[in-house]
Regions:
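Short, structured helix-loop boundary elements
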Residues: 6, 10, 34, 63, ...
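Short, Lys/Arg-enriched, disordered terminal segments
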Residues: 1-6, 122, 126-129, 135-145
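Alpha-helical linker/hinge and terminal dimerization helices associated
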Residues: 16, 20-23, 59, 102, ...
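N-terminal leader segment of winged-helix/HTH proteins
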Residues: 1-31
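Short, locally clustered residues in the helix-turn-helix/winged-helix DNA-binding domain
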Residues: 14, 42-46, 107
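N-terminal helix-turn-helix DNA-binding core of bacterial DNA-binding proteins
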Residues: 22-65
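Charged, amphipathic alpha-helical coiled-coil/dimerization segments
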Residues: 71-129
Length: 145
C-alpha cells in the first residue's frame, strides 16, 4: 500500500476533525458559540461542579486555550466561576440558567452534523465506539515532559 495521505489514519482523522468542527462552527453561529464553547457547555452539563483543571483534562485543552474561552462564556453569562470553599486554590465552574437554556437548544446541531456526514446511524455508532477506544487507550508511547 503506497504511503499516500489518504491511506494514513492520522491524516483521515485530522481531515475529518477539521471538517466536522467546521460544520459545527457554521451551525453554532446563530447561538454565538464556537465549537470549543459548545463542548465546554456539554462537559459542564455532565459535571455540575468541575474545576478548571478537570475541565481542561476532560476537553483535552490546555489552560492557555481554556482561560480565554471561559472568560468569553462568562461574559455571555453562560457560566460562572467561583473559588472552591474547601480549597481556595481551586476554581470551580458552573452552568448558569442562561447556559442551561442555550445548551438545551443545541441537540439539533449534533443531529444536523450527523445527517450531513452521510453515514448511517449504525455506522455512526460503530465509528464513535472505535474513536472512543482510540481516545481512551492507555498509550504505550508516553510524553516524557
Amino acid at each position: 500500500m503506497p504511503n499516500h495521505l489518504d491511506n494514513q489514519l492520522c491524516f483521515l482523522l485530522y481531515a475529518t476533525s477539521k471538517e466536522i468542527t467546521r460544520q459545527y462552527t457554521l451551525l453554532l453561529k446563530p447561538y454565538d458559540l464556537t465549537y470549543t464553547g459548545y463542548i465546554t457547555l456539554l462537559a459542564l452539563e455532565e459535571n455540575e461542579q468541575i474545576t478548571v483543571k478537570e475541565l481542561g483534562q476532560r476537553l483535552f485543552l490546555d489552560s492557555g486555550t481554556l482561560t480565554p474561552l471561559l472568560k468569553k462564556l462568562e461574559a455571555k453569562n453562560y457560566i460562572c466561576r467561583e473559588r472552591s470553599k474547601e480549597d481556595e486554590r481551586l476554581m470551580k465552574i458552573y452552568l448558569t440558567k442562561e447556559g442551561v437554556d442555550v445548551r438545551r437548544k443545541l441537540p439539533e446541531v449534533s443531529r444536523q452534523v450527523m445527517k450531513q456526514s452521510n453515514i448511517s446511524e449504525q455506522q455512526f455508532v460503530q465509528l464513535k465506539n472505535v474513536l472512543q477506544n482510540i481516545v481512551y487507550n492507555d498509550w504505550k508511547i508516553k510524553d516524557e515532559n
